[in-house]
């Protein structure tokens, strides 16, 4: 696990999951008042660099931003969000292709295709096509390992669920929300943003601790190795926070994004609810830790011990293999970028970058 600590707010908006690539780019489009700048170009053609320059310029002006990292290469950006301006600039190419719904009104296309010398690139047509195919094959293989690991982790979650006192969990969640979430006036407008705080990457699992510390001063950490208890707790807290009028940031589980929340932020209260487990341990001082074993029949749970240990060992090995394949895919992508970089007019890219900075800032 790589723990990224910075003063900035960092998220992912997409990741490889057991169901394949799962992205939250479209939900961002539908956040109230959001205007999108959609970058179009090839690999290695300056999309991430353009966004890094915009992020740097915004930070120098003291603007609050969210940096959206690429799960296939966390050192690269997939986007920059300006929460207060209700603007975002995104890499709108595969695997998270986006097209404008209302060009010029809701979205502005920032095309860099004109900076590519197609004549130079066509000289290496076969090499480029082969690298695209190899990259796709490696990513597909990695996804299958992640799917296998996800199946085992889901089995562990179901085993824990067999031993859980869910009525006790519900009572606890109700008391917790009553204590921490005062009901807002009826004029309050609840809302939800979807982000990923962690993902499986070529560097292994990455978890943005710095984001937690940037968005919150109070931390409620649910220590749950298998996820059945924390899953229900976060579902109940999410529903109650929205019912009480809060704007929240919901962070789905990168392994089971369709039906499990791992973390939840309430920025107006500087409050975070976090899940701590072997895949993304939470190492932050001053947390209020809740051991989810308190909600389990431990004697019943002991009967699953061998099964749970096997699942964890096997899932770890499968994810290690997925990470290795993702690293190979990144190397393949890096090689692909060399062909494109040799065919790009970066002076023209810089010109577009300056125009975009002036338009957004």
Could you say what each language-model-derived stretch is?
Residues 2-61, 220:
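N-terminal accessory targeting/assembly segments
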Residues 32-33, 85, 215-216, 269:
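Residue-level preference for short coil/turn positions at secondary-structure junctions
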Residues 36-55, 204-241:
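Glycine-rich phosphate-binding P-loop
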Residues 127-179, 310, 314-356:
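An accessory alpha-helical subdomain
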Residues 1-28, 167-171, 175-212:
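N-terminal pre-Walker A segment at the start of P-loop NTPase domains
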Residues 39-40, 50, 58, 66-69, ...:
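A cross-family "folded-core" feature that marks the main globular domain of proteins
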Residues 35, 185-190, 218, 351-358:
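N-terminal low-complexity, Ser/Thr/acidic repeat segments characteristic of secreted
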């Amino acid at each position: 696990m790589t723990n990224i600590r910075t003063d900035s707010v960092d998220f992912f908006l997409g990741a490889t999951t057991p169901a394949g690539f799962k992205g939250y780019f479209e939900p961002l489009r539908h956040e109230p008042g959001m205007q999108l700048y959609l970058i179009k170009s090839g690999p290695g053609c300056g999309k991430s660099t353009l966004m890094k320059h915009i992020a740097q310029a915004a930070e120098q002006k003291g603007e609050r931003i969210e940096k959206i990292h690429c799960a296939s290469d966390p050192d690269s950006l997939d986007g920059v969000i300006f929460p207060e301006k209700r603007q975002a600039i995104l890499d709108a190419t595969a695997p998270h292709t986006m097209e404008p719904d209302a060009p010029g009104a809701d979205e502005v296309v920032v095309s860099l295709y004109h900076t590519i010398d197609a004549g130079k690139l066509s000289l290496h047509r076969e090499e480029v096509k082969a690298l695209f195919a190899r990259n796709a094959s490696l990513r597909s293989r990695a996804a299958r390992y992640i799917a296998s690991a996800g199946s085992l982790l889901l089995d562990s979650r179901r085993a824990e669920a067999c031993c859980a006192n869910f009525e006790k969990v519900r009572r606890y969640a109700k008391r917790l929300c009553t204590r921490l979430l005062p009901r807002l006036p009826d004029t309050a407008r609840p809302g939800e943003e979807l982000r990923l705080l962690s993902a499986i990457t070529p560097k292994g699992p990455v978890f943005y601790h710095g984001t937690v510390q940037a968005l919150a001063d109070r931390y409620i950490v649910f220590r749950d190795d298998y996820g059945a208890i924390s899953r229900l707790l976060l579902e109940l807290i999410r529903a109650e926070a929205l019912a009480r009028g809060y704007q929240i940031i919901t962070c789905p589980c990168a392994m089971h994004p369709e039906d499990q929340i791992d973390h939840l932020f309430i920025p107006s209260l500087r409050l975070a609810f976090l899940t701590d487990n072997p895949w993304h341990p939470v190492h932050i001082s001053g947390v209020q830790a809740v051991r989810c074993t308190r909600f389990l029949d431990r004697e019943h749970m002991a009967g699953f011990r061998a099964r749970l240990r096997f699942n964890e060992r096997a899932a770890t090995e499968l994810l290690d293999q997925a990470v290795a394949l993702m690293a190979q895919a990144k190397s393949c992508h890096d090689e692909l970028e060399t062909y494109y970089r040799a065919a790009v007019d970066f002076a023209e890219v810089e010109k577009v970058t300056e125009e975009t900075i002036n338009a957004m800032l």
